[in-house]
Design a protein with these regions (language model features):
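Hydrophobic membrane-insertion alpha-helices, especially the h-region
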Residues: 1-3
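N-terminal Sec signal peptide cleavage junction
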Residues: 7-9
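Anion-binding catalytic surfaces of enzymes that hydrolyze or transfer phosphate/sulfate esters
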Residues: 196-255
Length: 255
C-alpha cells in the first residue's frame, strides 16, 4: 500500500509525504518485482508547517516526530492556482486529483473549462475501486475534485448528482442538504445514520454514500469520526479489491 499525506495552509504551502505500509520500527523489505496495489491519500485541511509543529509538540514534545515525518520521501510545494498566487481548496485539490493547475473555484476542469480525468476515473478503467472520506460535506471542494467536473465549487446540488453518477464506490461525509436521493436499498445505498456504518452490511453493496450531517460535521452532535469512517471505507474497499486490481482512498480531515 502506498500512503500519501498532503496538507494546505493559508500561506498556500503544501506538505507532501510518501511512504509504504511500514513503520519506522518495523520495516519490511519489498521485493524489487513487487508492485504497489493500493493507494491512500490523507489530506489535512489547513495543515501547514505550523500545524505540523503544534501536533508534534502536543503529542511528544519538540524532539518527537509524527509518523509521516519518518516516510522515506517528504517535500514542500508552493501550489498556486492558474489565476492567482493564492490557491483555494478547489484548485489545489484539482491539482492533486488530476495533475493540472486550474482557476480558483474550478473542479476537475482546466483554466479553459476542459474536462480533466481524475485519479478515480483513470484507475476505474484499470479495474480499481475508489473511496472518499471527509468531515466536511462530501460535496465540498476537496472531495468533489476527485469526481466532479464543474466551474464552481459552490454548485453543490449539481456536484451531489455527479457523485451519484460517478466511479466512486464509497463516499462518507456530510452534505445531506445537497442530495435529493432518499435513504434506500437501491444503488447507491444511501445511509444517514451512524449506526449503519457496519462493514457486514455495507460490504454487500456495490456503491455506498453515507451522509451524517446536513453540511459539515459538528462533533458535538455525535457524528462519526474521520478514523471511524476511514476504517469502514478501508474494509469496504479491501473486500471489493479481492476481485479487482486494487483501490484508491482519499481521506480528508476537513475544516
Amino acid at each position: 500500500t502506498l500512503l500519501l499525506v498532503a496538507g494546505g495552509s493559508s500561506d498556500d504551502i503544501e506538505l507532501g509525504a510518501i511512504g509504504s505500509d511500514t513503520t519506522s520500527s518495523i520495516r519490511r523489505e519489498r521485493s524489487p518485482a513487487s508492485k504497489t496495489k493500493n493507494i491512500l491519500l490523507l489530506i489535512g485541511d489547513g495543515m501547514g508547517p505550523n500545524q505540523v509543529a503544534l501536533a508534534r509538540f502536543a503529542t511528544g514534545g519538540p524532539d518527537h516526530r509524527l509518523s509521516f515525518e519518518n516516510f522515506p520521501i517528504t517535500g514542500i510545494v508552493y501550489n498556486h492556482s492558474a489565476d492567482s498566487l493564492y490557491t483555494d481548496s478547489a484548485a489545489s485539490a484539482t491539482t492533486w486529483a488530476t495533475g493540472v493547475k486550474t482557476k480558483n473555484r474550478y473542479l476537475a476542469i482546466d483554466a479553459e473549462k476542459k474536462f480533466l480525468p481524475t485519479i478515480p476515473e483513470l484507475l476505474s478503467t484499470k479495474g480499481y475501486k475508489s473511496g472518499l472520506v471527509a468531515t466536511s460535506s462530501i460535496t465540498h471542494a476537496t472531495p468533489a475534485a476527485f469526481y466532479a467536473h464543474i466551474d464552481s465549487r459552490y454548485k453543490e446540488k449539481e456536484i451531489a448528482k455527479m457523485l451519484v453518477d460517478s466511479d466512486i464506490d464509497i463516499a462518507l461525509g456530510g452534505g445531506q442538504e445537497f442530495f435529493d436521493v432518499t435513504v434506500s436499498q437501491d444503488n447507491p445505498f444511501m445511509i444517514y445514520d451512524k449506526k449503519l456504518l457496519d462493514s457486514t452490511l455495507l460490504n454487500s453493496k456495490e456503491q455506498v454514500i453515507g451522509l451524517f450531517a446536513e453540511d459539515g460535521f459538528d462533533r458535538r452532535l455525535g457524528t462519526p469520526t474521520q478514523l471511524e469512517m476511514t476504517q469502514v471505507a478501508l474494509n469496504f474497499l479491501e473486500n471489493k479489491s479481492q476481485s479487482c486490481a486494487g483501490f484508491f482512498l482519499m481521506s480528508e480531515g476537513s475544516q
